[in-house]
Structure formats: C-alpha cells, structure tokens
Amino acid sequence: PELIFLDEPFSGLDPINTDVFKGVLSELIGAGKYIVMSSHQMSTVEEYCRDLVILNRGKTVLQGNLRQIKASYGHTNLSVSCGTDILPLAESHGLRLLEKTAGGYEFKIDSDASAQAFLEELVARRIFPERFEIREPSLHEIFIEKVGATD
C-alpha cells in the first residue's frame, strides 16, 4: 500500500526485533511509502518523521516540519560531561539545570555567549570537560515543554 498507519510500532518489541522492524520501516520510506505513525517515543519520531503533530487531550499543541520546529528553538541546550561538580559555577553563569545524570549535566542556556563564558571559566579553573556541546533541544524536550505548558 502507498499509505501505512502504525500505532506505537515499537511498543513491546525487544531490541533485536526493534532493529529488524526499523530496517523494514527504512525500506518502506525509501520506497516512497507514506507512513502515519502514532508514538510516545520521541526518539522514534525524530528518526523517521519529517512532519509531525503533537496532541494533548485531543488538541494540537504543535505541528509542522520537524527540522523547522527544532530550528525555531535554536541551540538552547548545553550538554556537559565532567567528573567535577560544576553546578554552582554553571548557575552563577545563568545556566539552568535541566537534568543531572551519572555522566554529566544538561543545561538550558540563553545564548552561546553565556556558554562560552562558562567554558572559559571552567578552563581558567583547570576544569576540562570530556564533552561540551551546545545543541538544539530534542523532540522529547520540546514535547515536555509543549504538553506541560497546556496541562
């Protein structure tokens, strides 16, 4: 068929079958098939969808081309992997903590300049992060912002 509907296509699949199904999905997309997918796994949506609609309680909260949506947010996130506690220093530079993990930190930044100043201070204090990446927010983060804003 030219049009395929998938409802939570990866739900309940183990990693091996997930990879098998991803291969099938890629083949279908490569063959020019149109796929309408409902999913709560935003990483899957990012991987396979060009256009999207995010619904909350039956109402559209975001729709459009995925690249354009993400581009409209800009590079507002900072990922830092570091073995040192850098949170107080980050907060003193106006960075807002989104998440602390075993491997590092995720911050929201107002500008590249604030991230640059933060990095300069880290280096001046002889703190050298393994990773320092300014990036656009993930679709998962955008979903949380949009759906959380309408609840």
Predicted regions and their residues:
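Short, charged/small-residue-rich alpha-helical element at the C-terminal edge
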Residues: 76-146
